[in-house]
Amino acid sequence: MDFAVIVQHGVVYGLVLSVLFTLVLLGAVFVNTEIMMNDYPPEVKKVYGAEKDPKTRGQRRVFSLLFLAVLFGVITWSVVSAARASSTPLTFLPIFVLIFIEVFTFNLWDLLLIDWLIFNTIQPKFIFLPGTEGMPAYKDYVFHFRGFLTGIVFSLVSALVLSGIALIVVNAAG
């Protein structure tokens, strides 16, 4: 398959993944800000303290399952779409590139739009954990950049694993 088509599919489905993940993330924060507390800067978590809402763990599980459903759904959709668009059977490398681009696209989207634009710059009131409003850590761009670097490693590892699974599924359906 032409790698230009793989890259195009990766970017398009990466943007779909990003929009859907953003909706799930915003939904989680609207339901209960504590759901996303693990992703907050350490200074904010220290001032806030332990989770205060007993429902948080259960809600976090629900939203984690939604994240996984979106991830697997979009990746499955993209691999099937790429396989249908290809005149030759997909091999590991194109599937890996496709999935890596999708996950990396979300990682970049998360850094630029969710973390730096919304969390660090716009700072809507609903993102603040009660009692931590105005803390300088809410403007810590470096904290989120480090998370982005970790996300690159996650993108590589998850793309390797998911590509192997996708290749098995594509060949079995073949």
Where do the PLM segments sit?
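Hydrophobic alpha-helical membrane-embedded segments
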Residues: V12-E34, E102-F119
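Interfacial segments of alpha-helical transmembrane regions
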Residues: S87-T105
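Short, membrane-exposed interhelical loops at transmembrane-helix boundaries
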Residues: I127-F145
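Hydrophobic alpha-helical transmembrane segments
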Residues: F63, D140-S158
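Interfacial helix-start motif at the membrane-water boundary
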Residues: Y48-V70
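Juxtamembrane non-transmembrane "cap" segments at the membrane-aqueous interface
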Residues: L113-E133
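Juxtamembrane boundary at the C-terminal end of a transmembrane helix
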Residues: L162-G174
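Short, strongly hydrophobic alpha-helical membrane anchors
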Residues: M1-Q8
